[in-house]
């Protein structure tokens, strides 16, 4: 969110825009003379810009003399369907008492909160169009973030410093990044890009060269340059149905804690497998405890971390490899209370299969 005091004064804004217009007139080639890559950028922006939303959030608190505005800021979002659903970051709107959505063409709508997932930094709103037909809304197509390659072109559209529909371009710089201090549910999920992402871009779309949303821009590295991060759209697609139907995400508490096996340390720790999760603690009576999962009792300090050895090593869930707690989080997205999942563990050098029943939903 932007600091409302960090804004250009109107004369400076007008001057900056005028200078930009003059530069474009002098330097930009005619569309017919643009390179193929430039034409692609232009076309993607033209198609996507109308679906990008300027999010304005206000937090109002009661005082002894009446309500007072405690804070306000701006961010970005984007339409995902013609019903008017808009995705953005939770940190853009968290704690807000009033949210406005500025759509393409200058239309402003009140926003109705549909659902939030703070652990994943996701919020879903719906534009209150007052019964107007949604056929003129232009949602953005959601792509496939599991089929990305480092080096491919990406485009970010948002509202940095309140500048509506600003476009920046770059490449995909990294995959599966772990960001310290990020929401706990995201873990090693982030996409990294060198496309400029600034305050106000949060919640906006990261697009591929076909104009498909591959991520939601979320984080900028404060101590670096040209280092931004986005939440993969496939991660978001897994929780969308629950946000729409329930307003929140089912996150079952399994009742155990685990740490990944340190790279290259399996032999030193006397383990028979080289990847998986070392079960550290199991709560009595929990779903994991009932399933028969076991923790160890021998503690070894290593690299500022104390590992509990001698217990189960979780290697797979329903046949899919698990190498980090984040893998388990992703697997459980979209699951339902009562679902039975198979845990593959190594105990005493032997593989075993345990069956765990997911617990009821708690509100």
Regions found by a protein language model. Name each.
Residues 2-17:
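Bacterial N-terminal signal peptides that target proteins for export
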């Amino acid at each position: 969110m932007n600091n409302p005091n960090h804004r250009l004064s109107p004369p400076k804004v007008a001057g900056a825009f005028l200078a930009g217009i003059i530069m474009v007139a002098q330097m930009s080639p005619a569309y017919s003379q643009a390179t193929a890559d430039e034409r692609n950028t232009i076309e993607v922006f033209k198609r996507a810009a109308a679906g990008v939303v300027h999010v304005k959030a206000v937090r109002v608190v009661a005082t002894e003399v009446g309500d007072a505005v405690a804070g306000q800021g701006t961010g970005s979002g984007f339409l995902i369907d013609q019903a008017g659903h808009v995705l953005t970051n939770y940190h853009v709107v968290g704690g807000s008492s009033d949210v406005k959505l500025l759509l393409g063409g200058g239309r402003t709508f009140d926003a109705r909160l549909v659902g939030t997932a703070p652990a994943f930094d996701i919020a879903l709103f719906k534009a209150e169009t007052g019964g107007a037909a949604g056929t003129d809304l232009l949602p953005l197509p959601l792509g496939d973030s599991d089929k990305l390659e480092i080096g491919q072109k990406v485009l970010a559209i948002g509202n940095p410093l309140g500048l509506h529909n600003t476009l920046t371009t770059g490449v995909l710089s990294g995959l599966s990044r772990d960001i310290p201090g990020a929401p706990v549910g995201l873990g090693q999920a982030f996409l990294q890009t060198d496309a400029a992402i600034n305050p106000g871009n949060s919640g906006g779309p990261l697009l591929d060269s076909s104009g498909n949303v591959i991520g939601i821009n979320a984080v900028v590295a404060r101590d670096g340059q040209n280092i931004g991060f986005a939440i993969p759209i496939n991660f978001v697609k897994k929780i969308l149905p629950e946000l729409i139907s329930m307003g929140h995400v089912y996150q079952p508490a399994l009742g155990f804690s685990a740490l990944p096996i340190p790279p290259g340390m399996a032999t030193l720790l006397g383990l028979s497998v080289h990847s998986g999760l070392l079960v550290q603690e199991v709560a009595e009576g929990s779903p994991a405890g009932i399933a028969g999962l076991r923790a160890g009792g021998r503690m070894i300090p290593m690299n500022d971390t104390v590992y509990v050895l001698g217990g189960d090593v979780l290697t797979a869930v329903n046949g899919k490899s698990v190498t980090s707690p984040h893998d388990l989080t992703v697997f459980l997205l979209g699951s339902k209370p009562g679902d039975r999942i198979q845990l593959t563990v190594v105990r005493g050098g032997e593989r075993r299969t345990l069956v765990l029943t997911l617990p009821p939903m708690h509100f």
